[in-house]
């Protein structure tokens, strides 16, 4: 089979959302929640022709009688049976393709355990019978989507954040820093501070409302303390939000207090460094000769970097940390929510990439460990 003639499939599996589509496209065709729902009680719903499992939005809309599970926790796959269900749903329901006819590019988080990489490879070749596959690091793909091969990426999604220094297309393993603070933690914090204001959000449906408030109304303050004073002395920063039942609530300083936790994890009672310090610490672990290329190419990626004001604040914080002669540049592309997927789409459609795929023949000869040889991704 001539691989060039067939469009490759690109799947970016995140802790919260799965993004999937075809290489060469400029956006994913399918974006759905990475959840698997299974009936809580057998027999009760048989009359309605109930299925054994539901994926994504289908699972969400039936959550009343399903047990919902996220197979990816903090960026790492923890349940392979459920993960397989999500991939099956992606191929057959979302994209309407036969996986045995398309090469598949999957994404992984930095420092993904070796056995996980092997398991992904095994499932693609043995369960889905793909003709070829490849596994690429999410942050490296984000960098590609910005048209660069050297830079530092702060990738922050729903489950986990990483600072990854990349030189000429290869991640520098010793400089990868992980931060277990991301979108889910910000939503929990928003719920906590709104509860203190007297609003109550407890059910799963209400948690979705919190997420919506966070995504629509939050922003990052350039100067947090000054913004707190402004919020205390006037109502200019207040916004109204209409709940599904028609009730209108007011959101004030919560708008910027919520994402402030990215810069001040102590607000969540966490002792870790903020995202700005994490970027700085990653750069400082790199060779002194390449630091200026990293400071000059700071790429923000992932849904939890979508807050208005985040790039200006990052510039201010890094300028304060870096040597005074260093030129700082923050790149925050408007489509950065999907930049990992877009980078995968670009990579998989390059003619120079076609020899990089792991073929079915190579897999049959070497087994799952072939993934470490063919998809090294790291600078040796």
From Swiss-Prot:
Q: Which SMART domains match?
A: ACTIN
Where is it localised?
Answer: Cytoplasm, Cytoskeleton
GO:BP terms for this protein?
Answer: phagocytosis
Q: Name one GO molecular function term.
A: hydrolase activity
Gene3D superfamilies to which the protein is assigned, alphabetical: 3.30.420.40, Actin, Chain A, domain 4 (3.90.640.10)
Pfam families to which the protein is assigned, alphabetical: Actin (PF00022)
Catalytically driven reaction(s): ATP + H2O = ADP + phosphate + H(+)
Q: Which of the seven top EC classes does this enzyme belong to?
A: hydrolase
Alphabetically sorted, this entry's keywords are: ATP-binding, Cytoplasm, Cytoskeleton, Hydrolase, Nucleotide-binding
Cross-referenced InterPro entries: Actin, Actin/actin-like_CS, Actin_CS, ATPase_NBD
Q: What are the GO cellular component annotations?
A: actin cytoskeleton; cytoplasm; extracellular matrix
Its Enzyme Commission number(s) read: 3.6.4.-
Q: What does this protein do?
A: Actins are highly conserved proteins that are involved in various types of cell motility and are ubiquitously expressed in all eukaryotic cells. Multiple isoforms are involved in various cellular functions such as cytoskeleton structure, cell mobility, chromosome movement and muscle contraction.
Task: Please report which protein family the annotation says this sequence is part of.
Answer: Belongs to the actin family.
Name of protein: Actin-18
Gene giving rise to this polypeptide: act18
